[in-house]
Every structure is written in C-alpha cells, then in structure tokens.
C-alpha cells in the first residue's frame, strides 16, 4: 500500500516508524511543518517527524500553508497514493487533498471520539480528571475531527500520569491501531461509523493564561491542571514565577493509586487533619518530603518545582535551596 505521511511532533513518530518497519507499506513522502526557531540560540530546528524521515532517506515537504501551496498539491496528486496518514500534522487539509488518495485520509486522534475533538485532547482530558482515554482512527472530512470513526483503543489514566506520560503511551497505541486500520480498510473489513455530534466535546488550543494556578481551586483540580498542562503551570513565589511540575492531592481517597516510593514518603508526614491556612499558604514542611500548600479545598504536596533559569528540582530540594518557611504564600504576587 502506498502511503503519504503527514505529521510533526514526537507523538507522530511511532506511527511513522511502524509504517516504515512494515513491508506491506511504502511511504512515498513525508509532509511536516516548517522548521521552527528555538528560543535559545535562535537556530532553526526540524520537527521530530522530519528527523525520522531524513534518517530513512524519504522525501520531505514543508509547505508554509499547504492549502495554497500549488507545488505541493501537484506533487501529492502525482504520487497517486492509496492513503494519506495524518498524525498531529498541525495544518487543516483542504477538500482537494482529502479527495486525492484512493482509500481516503486516515487520521490518528488522541482521544475517544467524539469526546475531545481539537488540538489538545490529551491535556484537557487530564485537566478534567478523566480516568480513561484512547486513540481513535477516522476518515477525515472537512471538519475539525468530525470524520467517520474507524477503530478505537483505550488506556487507563493514573492519578500521577502527566500529559507526557499519556502522550507516550498513546503514540505507541496509535501506531499499532493505524496499521490495523489500514489493513482492514484495504480488505473492506471496516464500516465507518458517523460521530454523534450531540455527544462531542472540544479540546481547544492551550493559551498562556491556562497555565496560571488559582489557589482557590481544590487540591485535586490544581493537581489535574499541573499534570494536564505539564510542565508549564505557574504560580508566583517571592515576586518571581515558579513552575510546579509535579504534585499530589493529599487525602485517603487518593492513596490507593500511590507507588510504593511515594507511600513511604507520605508516611513521614505529620497529622495534617488540624492544619489549615489561606489558599496558597505553605502550611507544613516535612524533612525529605517538601512543602504542603493549602488550596480552596484540601492540601497539595509540591513534589517537583522549577525556578526561573533552573532545572526542575524535588520539593525538598526547593525547600532547602530557598529556605522556605511555613506561612509563606504562593500566588498573589508574593
């Protein structure tokens, strides 16, 4: 089967790799986003998909706006591909492109459709505290993730999973599911299922303001935000930004999901039942563990943080390095 692959980030690499390892498929070309400039050094950096394609001597096309790039459109048409495979490409494909391949354009989407259509399904799924997510393959149409569904695969989400953890798992699942989907499409063993638009939810592009932590929210809500938008959630500490990259909401309801090393750590904590403070206030510090902050509902353990210009560090190293004291308040420009 002749394939053209459209994809850009690390999430798309395992699917391309699975196609390249399978002799049933011939990847004719790879379409990816233009190289981007890094913040540091201002160097142009190729996408992970481009790196993989170059390593396998594949033609790579990087149109700025594929809808209006006549040269790319002509080259795609001339390839006469059986299917286009699209995994987190980052541009909307025109109907002209969608109509080119014989079997259609197959998209690998990081959610259980019709839930979490859109640009950031994994992040918003974690933000909302979902306990399961998955991959859906679908035949693309002109809408945003509205095409008929082909196959689905699910995976559980643990309370300590962050967006990177889930993305890595789903990227592998997606590669396997895509191969199965293409086989069954070719053999006409799949009946595409239209999505129920009434049941659809949307995962919009994440904005900078989504990273700000509001300490009046509950410990569980803040924890879900921190792991969903990992590693970018930010508060303030002594009038400078502080990223919180890992946390844990304290309470018996969550303890069953703890790995042994975290269970041992929490056994060092004092009785917290009588401790309280204002939202964002550091209410307890335990040697070898770190700081605990009051939230609008419940207490939040700061497991890992990152100061400006520094590497991420454990909660306890943060306490030691800054000489943090009980009573200091996070947020509110403090």
Swiss-Prot record:
Any single Pfam family the record assigns to this protein: Formyl_trans_C
InterPro entries, sorted: Fmt (IPR005794), Formyl_trans_C (IPR005793), Formyl_transf_N (IPR002376), Formyl_transf_N_sf (IPR036477), Formyl_transferase-like_C_sf (IPR011034), GART_AS (IPR001555), Met-tRNA-FMT_C (IPR044135), Met-tRNA-FMT_N (IPR041711)
Keywords associated with the record: Protein biosynthesis, Transferase
Single Gene Ontology MF annotation: methionyl-tRNA formyltransferase activity
EC number(s) on file: 2.1.2.9
Positions with a binding annotation for (6S)-5,6,7,8-tetrahydrofolate: 111-114
Gene3D superfamilies named among the record's database cross-references: 3.40.50.12230
Annotated Gene Ontology cellular component terms: cytosol
Annotated catalysed reactions: L-methionyl-tRNA(fMet) + (6R)-10-formyltetrahydrofolate = N-formyl-L-methionyl-tRNA(fMet) + (6S)-5,6,7,8-tetrahydrofolate + H(+)
Superkingdom, natural source: Bacteria
Family: Belongs to the Fmt family.
Function: Attaches a formyl group to the free amino group of methionyl-tRNA(fMet). The formyl group appears to play a dual role in the initiator identity of N-formylmethionyl-tRNA by promoting its recognition by IF2 and preventing the misappropriation of this tRNA by the elongation apparatus.
Descriptive protein name: Methionyl-tRNA formyltransferase
Organism: Trichormus variabilis (strain ATCC 29413 / PCC 7937) (Anabaena variabilis)
Designated gene of the protein: fmt
